[in-house]
Curated annotation (Swiss-Prot):
Belongs to the cytochrome f family. GO terms for cellular component: chloroplast thylakoid membrane. Heme binds at F37, C57, C60, H61. GO terms for molecular function: electron transfer activity; heme binding; iron ion binding. It comes from the Eukaryota. Keywords: Chloroplast, Electron transport, Heme, Iron, Membrane, Metal-binding, Photosynthesis, Plastid, Signal, Thylakoid, Transmembrane, Transmembrane helix, Transport. It comes from Porphyra purpurea. This is Cytochrome f. It is found in: Plastid, Chloroplast thylakoid membrane. It is a single-pass membrane protein. Its cofactor is heme. The gene is petA.
Length: 320
């Protein structure tokens, strides 16, 4: 008993440390490293999936990228299973960070499960599944939506595949659950977004000219970034600020047009969504199917034996 109590205490301590490190990562590291934050959606939207089927992460991560989901076709009630979200991207990709420097990409994901499905508790995980999901802090989208799970930001180089341990409901105990085929929706993003929840643009955007005219001077700032001095076609001076880290593709003396791209597109990330289906299978139905197949095979065997017997009788009668 003392050994079990000690193990439980150690597990709780590890969980608490993981939670604390995740919070510190969000508060301290994240603003400079990545905006792959499902937490932004949690703060701004009651549900991450709009009526149109669009997942709200796409409102900030404007580039479209692929995401894959792997889940079993069918599961039994009160069973733990894996759902794998794959977020691929180029190994050599480096993104522009909030301070203008270059860094690796972080990833985040949201999994929208059917009602009744939820994150599997730690005491239901197998040793193998515990090993696969260690150092991952997966949480419900809200206290009222335990079927919606989010994770992120986490380093993308080690987490291109994120395993979600899921517990299926038991219709015998949960009257809201039924043996049925259900959809699972998933969204996954890599890298920083282009728009903050406030509506402001990040520095991870293509910069367009704010006026038509001639570039008189490109002034480099000490803390990074530029000021592009444009003499507009109306002979007025327009000074356009360029955030740190953005690479210009125009030069002094060049004539530009309004809304013309004057920088390279720094974004190497993006968001994608996908879906699959899963069947909550009744054990009684499986037993019934097994019994049906057994009876069918048995009937076939008796039919063949009866046919053989009939053929022998016919052959004997012909000999007489």
């Amino acid at each position: 008993m003392k050994l079990n109590s000690l193990i439980n205490l150690i597990q709780k301590s590890i969980y608490s440390c993981t939670l604390l490190l995740t919070i510190l990562n969000i508060i301290c590291i994240a603003p400079n490293s990545s905006n792959a934050f499902p937490i932004y959606a949690q703060q701004a939207y009651e549900s991450p999936r709009e009526a149109t089927g669009r997942i709200v992460c796409a409102n900030c991560h404007l580039a479209q990228k692929p995401v894959e989901i792997e889940a079993p076709q069918a599961v039994l009630p009160n069973t733990v299973f894996e759902t794998v979200v794959k977020i691929p991207y180029d190994n050599n990709a480096k993104q522009i960070l909030g301070n203008g420097s270059k860094g690796g990409l972080n990833v985040g994901a949201v999994v929208i499960l059917p009602e009744g499905f939820k994150l599997a508790p730690a005491n239901r995980l197998s040793p193998e599944l515990k090993e696969k999901t260690k150092n991952l802090y997966i949480q419900p989208y809200s206290t009222k939506q335990s079927n919606i799970l989010v994770i992120g930001p986490i380093p993308g180089d080690k987490n291109r595949e994120i395993i979600f341990p899921i517990l299926s409901p038991d219709p015998a105990k949960d009257k809201q659950a039924h043996f049925f085929k259900y959809p699972i929706y998933v969204g996954g993003n890599r890298g920083r977004g282009q728009i903050y929840p406030t509506g402001d643009k990040s520095n991870n955007n293509l910069i367009s000219a704010s006026a038509s005219g001639k570039i008189n001077k490109i002034e480099a700032l000490e803390k990074g970034g530029f000021i592009v001095h444009i003499t507009s076609t109306k002979d007025s001076e327009v000074n356009q600020s360029i955030p740190a880290g953005v690479e210009l593709k125009v030069r002094e003396g060049e004539t530009i047009q309004l809304d013309q791209a004057i920088s390279k597109d720094p974004n190497v990330g993006g968001f994608g969504q996908n879906e699959t289906e899963i069947v909550l299978q009744s054990p009684n139905r499986i037993k019934g199917m097994i019994a049906f197949f057994f009876v069918s095979v048995l009937a076939q065997i008796f039919f063949v034996l009866k046919k053989k017997q009939f053929e022998k009788v016919q052959a004997a009668e012909m000999n007489f």
